[in-house]
């Protein structure tokens, strides 16, 4: 048994404009090469674009998109007796949120469009409506977990 005390969980900081932790989580995933101001600019312009297009609260659209994409289960590779099984495991809400943000940004990067602002805003609006590549990724993960339910006892 370890003698060290358990590390305290870091609380996520909130962003300067909306004072929202979720926005900060998305910004930190957009971030490339330490250019945080650029990441903030991309997300804030995408949020402004969502507000112009939908005339709804853009943060509620962001929240709904992340909620729709968040998976309940995922599959992990587990090696048993020389063969590898994809074992379905439940995931916590924070890990699910992280996966959802990662999938949303990955889907928006693959999208065709002018720039990241438009691609991200359209992907978020699609996910909030219930379609888009990020939603497809979640459904694919759930299908994989359902197909490998027989291996759930290997957890």
From Swiss-Prot:
Where does this protein reside within or beyond the cell? Plastid, Chloroplast
Query: Where is it mostly found?
Result: plastid
Checking InterPro entries in the record gives: Ribosomal_uS7 (IPR000235), Ribosomal_uS7_bac/org-type (IPR005717), Ribosomal_uS7_CS (IPR020606), Ribosomal_uS7_dom (IPR023798), Ribosomal_uS7_dom_sf (IPR036823)
GO term, biological process aspect, one: translation
From the Swiss-Prot or TrEMBL record, what is one GO molecular function term?
Answer: rRNA binding
Q: Which SUPFAM superfamilies match?
A: Ribosomal protein S7
What does the entry list under GO cellular component? chloroplast; small ribosomal subunit
Keyword annotations for this protein?
Chloroplast, Plastid, Ribonucleoprotein, Ribosomal protein, RNA-binding, rRNA-binding
This protein's assembly is summarised as:
Part of the 30S ribosomal subunit.
PANTHER family from the xrefs?
A: RIBOSOMAL PROTEIN S7
Say which family it is in: Belongs to the universal ribosomal protein uS7 family.
Q: What's this chain's function?
A: One of the primary rRNA binding proteins, it binds directly to 16S rRNA where it nucleates assembly of the head domain of the 30S subunit.
For this entry, the protein name equals Small ribosomal subunit protein uS7c
Q: Which gene encodes it?
A: rps7
């Amino acid at each position: 048994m370890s003698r060290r005390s358990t590390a305290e969980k870091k609380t996520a900081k909130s962003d300067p404009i909306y004072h929202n932790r979720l926005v900060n989580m998305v910004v930190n995933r957009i971030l490339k090469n330490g250019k945080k101001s650029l990441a903030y600019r991309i997300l804030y312009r995408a949020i402004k674009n969502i507000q112009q297009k939908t005339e709804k609260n853009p943060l509620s659209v962001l929240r709904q998109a992340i909620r729709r994409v968040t998976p309940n289960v995922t599959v992990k590779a587990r090696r048993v007796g020389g063969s590898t099984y994809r074992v379905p495991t439940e995931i916590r809400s924070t890990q699910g949120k992280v996966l959802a943000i990662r999938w949303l940004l990955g889907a928006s990067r693959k999208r065709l469009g002018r720039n990241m602002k438009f691609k991200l805003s359209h992907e978020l609006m699609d996910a909030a409506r219930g379609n888009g590549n990020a939603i497809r990724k979640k459904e694919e993960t759930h299908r994989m977990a359902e197909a490998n339910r027989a291996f759930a006892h290997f957890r």
